[in-house]
């Protein structure tokens, strides 16, 4: 039977071990980063999100873009002068949803990184380009459902337009409901090509309407945003 003094020493030793473990957990990323260089630390940070999960809040949208599975591959890192900022270029294979909309995406992603307190971390989202495309798609869906032509005009590129018979058919409906059931996205360097599976419900003076289908959409990058081109439909 151990004496109270022996139990006290064991308890003190356990406290020391736990304290060391906490210090190592905090300091390990910094130590590894110094030993391996920023490129390895940035790549490790991106790959870590595959286990931690990916959830991105979009501006003006209460529901986050949430991934079920995602994988970064072919990652390269570009360090900026000064050594405090960098950019990771990668391919991102993503499957998830935004609200009730299923999303599958494959293609190019560019992730800005900054060094904070000796640790490299994404400056914002770990999938900023995917988030920008999904935000544009969701804003379009909302504007179509609301019949908001001013909002629709803000979503198109400089040389694009919002006119067309398909758009007129949507806006002609009363009690309109426009659902994007799925978006299948292919991300290129400066462009995104999307197949949308949609459902449109509403009423005309002569009859109710309940239609479903698929359409192809194209978005072009302008800075950090994506705009529809040549048309919204």
Task: Tell where the protein language model's regions lie, with residue ranges.
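Surface-exposed beta-loop interaction hotspot
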Residues: 121-149
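Hydrophobic membrane-insertion alpha-helices, especially the h-region
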Residues: 11-29
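Aromatic-capped interface at the extracytoplasmic side
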Residues: 28-37
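Short beta-strand edge/turn micro-motifs at domain boundaries
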Residues: 2-4, 87, 99-131, 191-193, ...
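Short solvent-exposed beta->alpha transition segments
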Residues: 39-96, 149-197, 204-207
